Amino acid sequence: MHRYRSHTCAALRKSDVGSTVRISGWVHRVRDHGGVLFIDLRDHYGITQVVADPDSPAFQMAETVRGEWVIRIDGLVKARTEDTVNKTMATGEIELYAQEIEVLSAAKELPLPVFGEPDYPEDVRLKYRFLDLRRETLHRNIVKRTQVISAMRREMGNVGFTEYTTPILTASSPEGARDFLVPSRIHPGTFYALPQAPQQYKQLLMVAGFDRYFQIAPCFRDEDPRADRLPGEFYQLDLEMSFVTQEDVWNTMGPLMTSIFEEFAEGKPVTKEWPRIPYDEAIRKYGSDKPDLRNPIVMQAVTEHFAGSGFKVFAGMIASNPKVEIWAIPAKTGGSRAFCDRMNAWAQSTGQPGLGYIFWRKEGDKLEGAGPLAKNIGEERTDAIRTQLGLDDGDACFFVAGDPAKFYKFAGEARTKAGEELNLVDRDRFELCWIVDFPFFEWSEEDKKVDFAHNPFSMPQGGLDALQNQDPLTIKAFQYDAVCNGFEIASGSIRNQSPETMVAAFEKVGLSQQDVEDRFGGLYRAFQYGAPPHGGAAFGIDRIVMLLVGAKNLREISLFPMNQQAQDLLMGAPSPAAPTQLRELSIRPIPPVKKD
């Protein structure tokens, strides 16, 4: 028999009854039932119930073991009685009668429990992450993450992609987030950077003729901590394709990601045909470029119904500024004054003046609008709004007014709040879509100039002609995001592979041809030697896994994450370097300036 085990703790079945076996694992818990000891032994695969009765030669040792000790048990497999069968366990029809127990490793008193969902401070859990990872939910999440990545590799191979790895030590990139820098010992005073993404390398692979590339790529960004992103590093399914339009990318990756979601969705419905929603339409209907389509609320403009109306606040805004619009947020089943007042109070708590509203109720056979706005604009306009929005008895509608460029985010938050408060959101499904036709440029209020709205390497729609002859703020890009349940899970574009068009695009944001050559020299040079039309995307693995397992926090799907202060409490990073290391790197730390 093997030194440590003949079976795992999830392997034994009724067919093994009568066999003498050996298992090893962690003591999950010990229970004393009338002098008979029951030990739940746990390993990576599952749990087996072990019985040590007073007549067993192993009983004396069984009395000494404690939770999370690592032990080996030899014993006889017996069938459980019918009334003790546990159908929730894979091994629930048997139990192992211990004949010999060996302690392989004792455990000190635990700083936190390893079963259930402990409400322990996050820093304690991260410091003792090796214990936290023993929890069933977290352990299962990590295994699921690995399975999802394996499925991604399989599916990408099935549609003709090949995995290539790109360098981890690379040049610092001036665009995007702050780089993590790595000093060079051989070239004092110079630095490598950890890649924020393999963007330029994957495009160079297309120029080199590799056609369909992918990798499970680690990405590093020195960003301030955010709730929806792990500090330091994250992983993405990175891909690039040659001789493609954006429709080719959508038609390849939409079905592929649907199959991934269906494989791990545990029966929840998954969108098969992803809608393609233009960016402007997404902002107009949902107040967000990453809409949660499980929420059925669709906003509409109702400006005409308030123009010249008796509600002087809205009517005056419309008359004085052509940019002003009134957006309606329909809320089916929200037609009670209590709910409307609750939404109004919520709006005020976010710093807004409030939310105007109308709700409808039947008075006898007549359907009437109620609330201050209904009284001010009159019955005819109120009914016209109700008809346009398809509302009825017991429904409500909220209104946001002003320049949509300034209020759309709040309108989107109000849509989300109403949908959640009224339980309109079906949480047991995965709604996926493409957001397309992003603006190529945007106006930077901070710098008072035109800047890139998203990816500067995207191809502008209309190409060089658009850059030379259009208002830059009207130019769209061949750029797209994939969205699931209100989360951006991917971003991609058709790339700008023309040197002339590339320079023209950067000139719009104030960079010269020399700046382009200095900052993106490798890519710029490559495009002068025959670059195929190409495009791709990057899918966020961490976020996809978080959605699939229903985790609320990215730390629940990551092995050894940092805390919100970007510290690895388990390994003690970051930490000061030894003086000899700093001398080798020609570096002298400068203490930060203390703020008064």
UniProtKB/Swiss-Prot annotation:
EC number in record: 6.1.1.23
Pfam families attached to this UniProt entry: GAD, tRNA-synt_2, tRNA_anti-codon
Amino-acid positions noted as binding L-aspartate in the UniProt annotation, renumbered to this chain: 175, 221, 454, 495
Binding site for ATP: 221-223, 488, 540-543
Annotated region (Aspartate), positions in chain: 199-202
CC per GO annotation: cytoplasm
Signal peptide (residue range): none
Coarse class of the protein's main subcellular location: cytoplasm
GO molecular function, one term: ATP binding
Gene3D superfamilies documented for this protein: Bira Bifunctional Protein, Domain 2 (3.30.930.10), GAD-like domain (3.30.1360.30), Nucleic acid-binding proteins (2.40.50.140)
Class in the EC hierarchy, top level: ligase
Site, as annotated: Important for tRNA non-discrimination: 33
Protein's cellular compartments: Cytoplasm
Record flagged with keyword Transmembrane: no
Spans through the membrane: none
Catalysed reactions listed for this entry: tRNA(Asx) + L-aspartate + ATP = L-aspartyl-tRNA(Asx) + AMP + diphosphate
GO biological process per UniProt: aspartyl-tRNA aminoacylation
Keyword list, A-Z: Aminoacyl-tRNA synthetase, ATP-binding, Cytoplasm, Ligase, Nucleotide-binding, Protein biosynthesis
Similarity-based family: Belongs to the class-II aminoacyl-tRNA synthetase family. Type 1 subfamily.
Assembly with partners or alone: Homodimer.
Functional description taken from the UniProt entry: Aspartyl-tRNA synthetase with relaxed tRNA specificity since it is able to aspartylate not only its cognate tRNA(Asp) but also tRNA(Asn). Reaction proceeds in two steps: L-aspartate is first activated by ATP to form Asp-AMP and then transferred to the acceptor end of tRNA(Asp/Asn).
NCBIfam families xrefs: aspS_bact, PRK00476.1
Descriptive protein name: Aspartate--tRNA(Asp/Asn) ligase
Gene: aspS
